[in-house]
Amino acid sequence: MNIFTEAAKLEEQNCPFAMAQIVDSRGSTPRHSAQMLVRADGSIVGTIGGGMVERKVIEESLQALQERKPRLFHGRMARNGADAVGSDCGGAMSVFISVHGMRPRLVLIGAGHVNRAIAQSAALLGFDIAVADIYRESLNPELFPPSTTLLHAESFGAAVEALDIRPDNFVLIATNNQDREALDKLIEQPIAWLGLLASRRKVQLFLRQLREKGVAEEHIARLHAPVGYNIGAETPQEIAISVLAEILQVKNNAPGGLMMKPSHPSGHQLVVIRGAGDIASGVALRLYHAGFKVIMLEVEKPTVIRCTVAFAQAVFDGEMTVEGVTARLATSSAEAMKLTERGFIPVMVDPACSLLDELKPLCVVDAILAKQNLGTRADMAPVTIALGPGFTAGKDCHAVIETNRGHWLGQVIYSGCAQENTGVPGNIMGHTTRRVIRAPAAGIMRSNVKLGDLVKEGDVIAWIGEHEIKAPLTGMVRGLLNDGLAVVGGFKIGDIDPRGETADFTSVSDKARAIGGGVLEALMMLMHQGVKATKEVLEVA
C-alpha cells in the first residue's frame, strides 16, 4: 500500500493519523531516511526500520494524536541512558511526528439559508461539515461545499442520534420551528460548543422550559444563545461571519475583541470590583465590553439572590456565565491575571482587598452596596469609585454613582454623597415591598423551587429552618438565596416578579446597566483628566 495514497484517503475522510519522518540519524540505525503512517488504532503503513525504535515511535505517534499536537522524538539504539529505546545498534535518530486528519467537525442542525452560508464559510476555515434536515429538498448538494456530509431524517431528534456527535464537535441548531426538539437531545451531551440561532425572547422561553424539565444549570450554562458577535449582521452571509467568529474564539481558546489598540484610553487596564452581586456584575459587563480587564472580589459565602445574573455564583459553582461572558473562581493573583488574558472575569474570595498590592489595578470600584463604607479608601488605586450611599466623593473616593431609581439613577457625583436609600424596592406592576421575600427567623436556607420557576401566591418556595416560606404573590421566581446559607431574621432571601413568564431572569437589569454606564463615564473622565490628591480633598485636575 502506498503511504501517500493512504494519507490522502484518510485526510479526505478526516480520519486521524500521524506521519513519522526520520529527520536525522547518526551511526548504526535501521533506516536513515524513511516515513511511516500511524493510524489512530496503532496500525501502520510503511516502516522506519522496525524493532524497538519503531514501537517507541508508534507509541509517541498515538500520544501526539491524543494531544492533537506534533512532536519531535529522539531515540538512541541503546539499553541505558537518556532516550534509550532498548536495542543494541549503537546509533541514534530523530523523528518528526505530525498529526493529520483532525479537522474540527461542525454539525449544522437545519439546512436553511443561514446554515448554508455557514457551511460555505466554514469549509474555507478547514471544518469537517455535517448538515441534517427533515426536508430532503433543503439538502441539495449544490447548496453546500463538495465534502459536506448531508443527512436526511424523519425528525431532528432522529437526526441528532444518527450524526454520532462527539465531545470535540461544534454544533449549531438553526431550524425553522423545531429547535426545541434538537435542543432537548443535545443540551446534556458533552460538546465542545453548542449554539442556538434564535431571538432573545425564544432563548428565554427555552431556558425556562429546560429548567422546568429539570435540566441542570451546568448543562444550561453551556448553551451559547443568542449566538454570534454583535456586528449588525442581517444577511445569511453576515450572520455566518458573526457565528463563525464565536466558534473560532472557543476553538482557539482566544479572548476575542479587536486586534487593534483601542482608540479609547482603557488600554485593557485592570479594574478591581468589590462585590460580585447582580449590580456589580452589570458594572463588570459594562467595563469588560469597553475593553477593561476586570477582577471581582467577594466574601466566602456571597448572599446574592439574583444568582443567574451575578458573577458571585462562581464562588459556589467554580464558573458563572452572564450574557455570554464567563467568570471563573481564582485562588491566586497569578491565576487571576492569566484568566483575564484568556478573556475571563476572575472572581476571588478577598473581602479585605488584601491582594490589591499584587494586582495593582488602575481602578477600584466598591459595588458591595452595603449602604456603608466597608473599608474602601481613595488611595486604593489611581481611580476609586463607589456605588450608592455611605461614601463621600472627594473624601472616601473620587466619584460616587447614584443608585436610587429615578431621574438621577447612574449620575456621577464628584463631590458629595448619593441619595439615602429609600428602602422601597422597584415598582413592578404595582408591587414593591410585597414581592420581596425575607426570612421570618434565623436559620438555614433550603429552597423548594428554582430561579425561573412560575409560582402561585401561597406556594411553598423555601424553608428557613422549620419555617415555611410562601410566595407572597403569583409570578416568576427571579431571586433566591443559595441553599445552605445561614441567615438572620429579616434577611432578604428572594423575590417574585409579578410579570410571570414574560419576566427575564437571565439578563442584567436596566438598573445595573444604568449604574454600569455611570461607572464607565466616571472612569473614562478621571482617566482623561487625572486625579490630583491634596491633604483633605481629592479634586479633578
From Swiss-Prot:
Classification via SUPFAM superfamilies: Zn-dependent exopeptidases
Stored InterPro entries: MoCofactor_Util/Proc, Se-dep_Mo_hydrolase_YqeB, XdhC_CoxI, XdhC_Rossmann_dom
Domain of life: Bacteria
Pfam hit, one: XdhC_C
NCBIfam families xrefs: matur_yqeB
Protein name per its UniProtKB record: Uncharacterized protein YqeB
Organism: Escherichia coli (strain K12)
